[in-house]
Design a protein with these regions (language model features):
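Conserved catalytic cores of very large enzyme subunits
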Residues: 2-342, 363, 368-525, 534, ...
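Contiguous, well-ordered alpha-helical segments that form the cores/surfaces of helical PPI scaffolds
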Residues: 118, 346-359, 380
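Glycine-centered flexibility sites
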Residues: 349-352, 460, 531, 542
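Long insertion/accessory domains within large nucleic-acid-processing enzymes
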Residues: 519-559
């Protein structure tokens, strides 16, 4: 694929308002209305009014959210047709690509690979491909083609890139190390606006997190790539919420989804996924009550409504031929849709905890100990409640620290209509999950120290970000320091952000309003939204407002 072809394909697939995408959008809008009209009036009203948000309504009675396919579904070294090592490598990567297409069109959310390094390594060994320097180069070339395809082709709903998350870093075999090294190197070498897939580097002290450990060099390579492209993000296996997990059985799906504990089978992420999710508007509950006792009473009522919605959805999915096809295809360890619904997770999420605490008179969470204690108590009650639902139903209910990409702007807009005198909505967005407000300006380590203890409540998935003033290019030690501190603070999953601007005229990169080299204001701005990187013009209204308010977490990280 030559440079001209790549550019043409990227320009063609970047046009979101195509016939196919327009047709899909209209169909999705109509399906959402149909679902809401069919729901019990109480639940439809809560969604329409912005009291909570039912995610992926257009797939209500059709498909699950996200999954991590079984390795044997993805790669089939026994079916390779070519005899040369390079041909076999290319075929295996093509099989992986075919899996992405198939699974992404069978569900509403992202697809993950739990151990991309180990799974690909085992397939390469089974295919008889030796871990030579020549074959390592061949794999790197195929990784480059795969990542280019994921970054440039908007094949999801004819308008979006596929949501793919590759977890890696723990395999110490020859091929496992090659897969990790070449994947990171391939991603680092691609243009900075090539932002797919999301690479997640698993950090485990004795394997790669300490000097002298077998894969420490790969950890440093990952840190160096992060200084240039904000990817990889880091799954911290020695952090308190992950410590009891088998590091080879847990991974991130999508931008933060965590699937591990299992009441109805073996614990782990592989061959499982999230069935459905719903997010609560916490500030709305505070605005409606203004007093703690009433707040907790209404919180439990809203969570109970959320539970009933998710149970209705599970019942609808049990009757879906599309869900049955997914269950019976070998993607999941479940053999039928009933077992799939028992093995999967049901997540109740939330956004706006910082605003909620302030409405209730607790002050600023980043500076007031009373506010932090109230935030902790709210999370504790929510986790106790979801655990109670799991006990009651026998299903895997969990608490999700929602990203809130779409709802971060939707919720405050609707609250403004109901509470025009409230201050919380005036900035145009609500803060992600339990995060420190983006305009707090607290230091890196202070932010991690505040958010760290809250992660243990969010067993359905969570992430902490730190926002640097600029890309720490050439300083991977900066990233390593932050990763190690986040681990000690109990952060299970970490992302490192910074503004990344690219001049569309001359290619200069940095942080600027106008290009310092040629003066052009034709600038592409790449930022992290939720878990994935996007160009700023693709952000939702709420996330654009959030980005305008972001301040760097400066003052206490190594420059």
């Amino acid at each position: 694929m030559n440079e001209k072809t790549v550019k043409q394909e990227k320009e063609l697939s970047a046009a979101r308002d195509t016939f196919a995408s327009t047709l899909f959008n209209e169909g999705a809008r109509m399906e959402k209305e149909r679902v809401l009209n069919a729901l019990p009036e109480e639940f439809a009203r809560l969604h329409r009014s912005g009291a909570f948000h039912i995610h992926d309504l257009d797939g209500w009675n059709l498909v699950n959210n996200c999954s991590t396919p079984l390795p044997e579904y993805v790669l089939h070294p026994e079916h390779l047709r070519t005899k040369t090592p390079g041909g076999r490598i290319a075929e295996l990567v093509e099989q992986f690509k075919e899996m992405i297409c198939t699974v992404q069109h069978r569900q509403s959310g992202g697809v993950g690979s739990c151990n991309f390094d180990r799974e690909m390594a085992e397939a390469l060994v089974a295919a008889g491909v030796e871990p030579t320097a020549e074959n390592a180069t061949a794999f790197g070339e195929q990784a480059t083609l795969l990542f280019t395809w994921l970054s440039t082709q908007r094949l999801r709903y004819a308008r979006e890139n596929f949501y793919v998350t590759l977890n890696m870093g723990l395999d110490t075999s020859s091929w496992g190390r090659i897969v990790t090294h070449e994947s990171i190197a391939a991603f680092a070498a691609l243009p900075v606006d090539y932002t797919r897939p999301n690479l997640v580097f698993k950090v485990k002290g004795e394997i790669n997190g300490r000097a002298g450990s077998p894969n420490y060099d790969l950890f440093l390579a990952a840190c160096d790539c992060t200084t240039r492209k904000m990817i990889p993000t880091y799954l911290l296996m020695d952090a308190e919420p992950n410590r009891a997990c088998d590091p080879f059985k847990i991974n991130i799906m999508g931008c933060r989804t965590r699937v591990y504990a299992n009441r109805n089978g073996e614990a782990g992420s592989v061959g499982r996924g999230n069935i459905a999710a719903l997010s609560l508007n916490l500030p709305r509950i505070a605005l409606e009550t203004k007093e703690l006792e009433k707040f907790f009473k209404l919180l439990k009522a809203r969570m109970n409504a959320a539970k009933r919605v998710l149970l209705l959805r599970a019942e609808a999915i049990r009757k879906s031929p599309f869900a049955a096809e997914m269950a019976e295809s070998g993607v999941w360890s479940a053999k039928n849709v009933e077992e799939m619904c028992r093995q999967g997770t049901y997540s109740i999420g939330f956004i706006g905890l910082a605003e909620t605490v302030e409405i209730l008179g607790g002050g600023k969470v980043q500076s007031d100990p009373r506010a932090r204690e109230l935030a902790r108590r709210i999370l504790e009650v929510m986790r106790e409640t979801t655990d109670g639902y799991a006990d009651e139903t026998g299903l895997n209910f969990s608490l999700l620290a929602s990203a809130g990409e779409g709802i971060s702007g939707r919720f405050p807009k609707m609250d403004a209509e109901l509470f025009p005198d409230a201050e919380c909505w005036k900035k145009g967005f609500y803060t992600n999950s339990f995060h420190v407000p983006v305009d707090s300006g607290v230091g890196v380590f202070e932010k991690l120290a505040y958010e760290g203890p809250f992660h243990r409540f969010a067993n359905g998935g969570s992430i902490s970000y730190v926002e640097l003033r600029e890309a720490p290019i050439g300083n991977p030690e900066c990233v390593a320091d932050i990763v190690l501190d986040a681990t000690s603070q109990g952060v299970p999953y970490l992302g490192i952000n910074y503004p990344l601007d690219i001049c569309n005229v001359c290619g200069t990169r940095g942080t600027f309003d106008a290009c310092p080299h040629c003066g052009s204001k034709n600038v592409k701005r790449i930022r992290r939204v939720s878990g994935y990187l996007e160009t700023l013009d693709e952000f939702s209204v709420g996330k654009k407002a959030e980005e305008r308010n972001r301040l760097a977490n400066s003052g206490n990280h190594r420059e």
